Amino acid sequence: MKRTRLVVLSDNRTNNKLLQTEHGLSVYLECPSGKYLLDTGASDLFIRNAKVLGIDLADVDYCLISHGHNDHIGGLPYFLKLNSKAKVILSGAIPGTEYASMRRYQHSLTGDVDFSQDKDRFVFVNESSNVGAVKVYANIDKRNPLPLGNKNLLCSDAAKQFMPDNFIHELAFVIDGVLFTGCAHSGILNI
């Protein structure tokens, strides 16, 4: 039986002195059903770290974007240039929405992604569904309390006015029976 392999390509910290760090998350997943990239960090750092580790991201079948904050989606333009085949699964609530943090001072969390390019590669999900071998959970019901760190996070409404982030842009993924999430802003107990 083939096992699931998980390799952190980008994070705030690392124990591997050969890898660089950034405020961002990117995880390479090698599962029985295929090769996946969960989030793309804030820059192209995940690509540089993958090269150091001998991981060929051109072979990835699906890129899974957990939510719209730039430390998870910021590297997507670099990934799309490197990998010509992978479908990108993300929330349909991400395009056109701006994100910000009020922690210490207001600063943007909006990723710089042109969704009009490579349109055929994006799979926008608004309802829980299956995409290939991936079970995608959207519109996560928030029955339990949300993480306290969310209180400083904002998103824009249709009029581009900021309001508390409702995290309708957050997705969770189940691949081969394993749950994957980014920050779990919706609360891990809710996911």
State what each model feature region is.
Residues 1-14, 151-159:
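Short Pro/Gly-enriched beta-strand edge/turn motifs at strand-loop
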Residues 94-170:
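Metallo-beta-lactamase
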Residues 45-96:
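Active-site metal-binding motif and surrounding structural segment of the metallo-beta-lactamase
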Residues 1-3, 33, 59-60, 85:
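A general structural motif
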Residues 13-16, 45, 143-146, 186-187:
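Short, acidic Gly/Pro/Ser/Thr-rich loop/turn segments
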Residues 69-72, 87, 166-191:
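Cap/insert and terminal regions of metallo-dependent hydrolase folds
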Residues 4-52, 165-181:
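Conserved beta-strand hairpin/beta-sheet module of binuclear metal-dependent hydrolase folds
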